[in-house]
Amino acid sequence: MSDSVNGYANGYANGLSENEIGESTKKIKILFYATHPSQPIGYGKIGNTISNFLAAQSNVELYYFAISNFPGQTDETRYINPNIKFIDALAEDAAIGSSELYGVDIIDRVMREIKPDIFIIYNDIIVTSRLLNALLQYRQEFKDVTRFVSYVDLVYPFEKLRYIRHIDRNVDYFFAFSDFWKKNLIDMGVRADKVGIFYHGFDKHKFQIIPSEVAKEHFGFSTDDFIILNTNRNTYRKAHDISMKAFLELLRRERMDSRIKLFINHQMDSLSGYNIYDLLEVECLKLGLVYEDVLNKHVFMFKNKVGHAEDSQINMLYNAADVGVNTCLGEGFGLCSMEHAALGKPQVISSVGALTDIFKNGGSVLVKPKAVLSVANHVDEHNGDLHICDYNDFADGLQMYFHNSSKRKVDGYDIREHILNTYNWNTILVEFMKDLKKIL
């Protein structure tokens, strides 16, 4: 089975006839609900891989109910299998004068037109619950026709039980992102035999090792610069306040060493997160650092300053950075951290969610939370347990890697080998197909 330069268009989709869904003579209709595959966020990346794989199966007819297809944010370099039949939720709603972002008001019509054998929802519990509410009548009428599957994105342990139970009553099967989340679903009352694990895989076609010195030169860095990377988007859950405090504490300890630099790939001001400029300025004031020097000599970002970058740019950035940092309060999977680590770059990360599964065997620094809060309704409607780490612990991990290049190399090698062996799309997609066969 040969690999394809277009990712999973051919390399991981062909030669799997023994794992195809159902009987080879029957076309199985699948409606896949997810973020549009051209979007730069994790939902888009994973949706792209899954849909290309399914569309390449000889007995699958794939419909893609694509949400969040925002113009001006697409990665035009991504391969999209031409067999996929798209329903663009934003375009469909715009045509009827609706401001709905998730296609909830058109999902019943689409389901009745397609009558899929399997309906896969790849989203969080709020969007999933809204869709299921809109489909209660359909499910009652066509319960023997369509199997409902929730590929559920949980980010905090013990999210709102009312939503979990509602989804449990109205789907035939769950896919969890990792062992951590499968256990949490079971702890919340979902039957163990109703939950499978569908990991995110590492895309070895899109992300490949480039010599560090070449990547650093591309961004104008010196070979001996110590580049710290945070690619998380700017939302409260990603806790960029902790990242900024940890980075500035490292600068303070190292007397503003000119080699220490932070590259961030997200919006610098976000209503759902922080104004990064304000964070830096106030923390510099606390620590006695010169804000202008920090901003102009130690903090870097892409010129657009909004966090939208093509996969090729991200690949170059992963290779330029020496370590990654992720200070989140909860994590569904941690795709950016996993991808960066898979290129041999150790991470300093919160020990939360799926990150505890990915990095449990070493090769990086897992920072243990110091406090737990229940998420308030006004912060996030799905609630759950929010885990907070001490920024000093992240500063300790970053400082250790700054002073120990051999440790960086050893840890980078170890975590890369672990990820390549564990999060291999070949294996993951075959297991996914086996689980889908059980559902029919």
Predicted regions and their residues:
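Carbohydrate-associated surface elements
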Residues: F180, G201
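A short helix/loop element that forms part of the nucleotide-sugar donor recognition site in Leloir-type
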Residues: Q208-F221
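Nucleotide-activated donor-binding/catalytic signature segment of Leloir-type glycosyltransferases, i.e.
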Residues: Y274-M316
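Aromatic "clamp/platform" in nucleotide-sugar-dependent glycosyltransferases that forms part
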Residues: L329
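A charged, aromatic-enriched C-terminal amphipathic alpha-helix characteristic of glycosyltransferases
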Residues: I388-C389, D393-F394, H403-L436
